[in-house]
């Protein structure tokens, strides 16, 4: 029988608590708990694809949002900081999967994400 603290149940407990730390690190690498999001929302797929063509042609994301988005258009599509659980499923999955990008060089969802609200072109400006 091994002495207490060397092997046995004690080692298992230590390993289990160690894995808890790596779970936290994994969560942080997958996008943390909040994202700073901009989006362009269009009820019709065709209008959303028009907006995407404008972005691809070099137009700024915020300008396209102001022209095409049916939600928050006056703020250039800026939704601010959004936390996990505050967005609809497909939107949240896409937002946390995107890398951080800038207005001049946006990385966005292509094809647009479909939700109950319509079609979204999503861009992430920050993560925490």
UniProtKB/Swiss-Prot annotation:
Residue ranges of every copy of the PpiC domain listed in the record: 32-126
GO molecular function: DNA binding; peptidyl-prolyl cis-trans isomerase activity
Keyword Chloroplast in annotation: no
Localization terms from the record: Nucleus, Nucleolus; Cytoplasm, Cytoskeleton, Spindle; Cytoplasm
GO biological process: rRNA processing
A Pfam family the protein falls into: Rotamase_3
Gene3D superfamilies: 3.10.50.40
Keyword Electron transport: no
Keyword vocabulary terms for this entry: Cytoplasm, Cytoskeleton, DNA-binding, Isomerase, Nucleus, Rotamase
GO cellular component entries: cytoplasm; nucleolus; nucleus; spindle
E.C. no: 5.2.1.8
Catalysed reaction equations from the record: [protein]-peptidylproline (omega=180) = [protein]-peptidylproline (omega=0)
Main subcellular location: nucleus
Purpose: May be involved as a ribosomal RNA processing factor in ribosome biogenesis. Binds to DNA.
Entry's family note: Belongs to the PpiC/parvulin rotamase family. PIN4 subfamily.
Protein name: Peptidyl-prolyl cis-trans isomerase NIMA-interacting 4
Source species: Danio rerio
Gene that specifies this protein: pin4
């Amino acid at each position: 029988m091994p002495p207490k603290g060397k092997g046995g149940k004690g080692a298992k407990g230590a390993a289990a608590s160690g894995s808890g730390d790596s779970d936290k690190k994994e969560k942080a690498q997958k996008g943390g708990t909040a994202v700073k999001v901009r989006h362009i929302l269009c009820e019709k797929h065709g209008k959303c694809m028009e907006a995407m063509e404008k972005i691809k042609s070099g137009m700024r994301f915020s300008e396209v949002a102001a022209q095409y988005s049916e939600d928050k258009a006056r703020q250039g599509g800026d939704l601010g900081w959004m936390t996990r659980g505050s967005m609809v499923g497909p939107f949240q999955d896409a937002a946390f999967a995107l890398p951080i990008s800038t207005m001049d060089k946006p990385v966005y969802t292509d094809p647009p994400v479909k939700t109950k609200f319509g079609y979204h072109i999503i861009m992430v400006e920050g993560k925490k």
